[in-house]
Design a protein with these regions (language model features):
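Phosphate-end processing signature that detects enzymes handling 5′-triphosphorylated RNA
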Residues: 1-190
Length: 190
């Protein structure tokens, strides 16, 4: 399924994360565990086109996503995977038709994608009037943990105002978060 994603992201300190967690009373909220496996081919074609290919395992579902970065919004091609698909594969010799079609539409030729990173995120969400507030605690492959605030919205202009207000109200300096895959690659070099 093709979706448009409009989100704003900010890295947090552990204390800022804890403060927001308490302020929005997330202690008793559902905790979503995301296990993300990121893939690229030998020529780094996904990175080259500003895209990421991942398989995400959560408490409720498994899906493959092709995420294509845009200036103010991202495009996501999400394909549910069932138990017939290999669990935590290190290579993806066969991609779902929806993802192949999007790559062909973009005129991108991909070799067999190989596993490049694996991360795990503990996620809490709360719906606010202006959008969805998401707090992520992410553990990367070398046991580095970071904290992130995401704010997902349906409208860019409304979202940017609400996100900046959220940061200001909570005395959080702007510290834009790179995508998790980019942070994973950076952390792997430490």
């Amino acid at each position: 399924m093709r979706e448009i994603e409009i989100e704003f992201k900010n890295l947090l300190t552990k204390d800022q994360y804890a403060s927001l967690f308490e302020k929005y009373n997330l202690k008793n909220s559902e905790k979503i565990i995301n296990k993300n496996f990121y893939y690229d081919d030998a020529d780094e074609n996904f990175k080259r086109i500003g895209a990421a290919l991942r398989i995400r395992y959560t408490n409720k579902k498994t899906e493959m996503t092709l995420k294509i970065k845009g200036e103010t919004q991202n495009i996501e091609i999400n394909v549910p995977l069932d138990e017939r698909y290999p669990k935590e594969p290190t290579a993806l010799p066969i991609l779902p038709n929806e993802i192949i079609a999007e790559l062909e539409r973009m005129n991108v030729k991909i070799k067999t994608p190989m596993l490049i990173q694996k991360i795990e995120t503990l996620r809490c969400e709360i719906a606010l009037e202006e959008g969805l507030l998401v707090l992520d605690e992410t553990t990367f492959i070398n046991d580095i943990i970071d904290y992130e605030l995401e704010f997902e919205t349906k409208d860019y202009e409304t979202g940017v105002v609400a996100f900046e207000k959220l940061l200001e109200e909570n005395n959080i300096d702007k510290n834009p978060a790179k995508p998790k895959i980019a942070r994973a690659v950076e952390y792997s070099k430490l």
